[in-house]
Amino acid sequence: DFKLQQPQSSVVVIKGDTLTLNCTASGSGPIGAVKWVKGWGSDNQTVYEHKGSFPRVMRAVPDPTNDFTIRISNVSLEDAGTYYCVKLRKGIVDDVVFTRGGGTEVSVHA
């Protein structure tokens, strides 16, 4: 049974600091990547995925591992929001969401 654990339900970070978002996977799931999104629904934005360039974001532990914790450097007030760790299932055309973590609500203080 595959699960994504996001141990922090909420985090407070100071503007300009580095934000750490924790996510670990347990169990075996389908083939597919894990990515991070901010928000949920039609207006969510991808914060980090394996392919693509995300200059302020890096994985805390390099591949391959079941730890998908990321660090976002030089946090701005616009970074406030709820972040989800998302497991994708590889599809023929597009990857589809298999499961997601419980979400971490991020507050940024100036």
Report residues per predicted region.
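N-terminal V-set
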Residues: 24-56, 88, 92-93
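Extracellular beta-strand/loop-rich beta-sandwich domains predominantly from IgSF
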Residues: 9-11, 55-80, 90-92
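N-terminal edge beta-strand
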Residues: 1-22
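Exposed loop/turn and edge beta-strand positions of beta-sandwich/beta-sheet ligand-binding modules
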Residues: 7, 17, 53, 66, ...
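Extracellular/luminal immunoglobulin-like beta-sandwich modules
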Residues: 76-78, 82-110
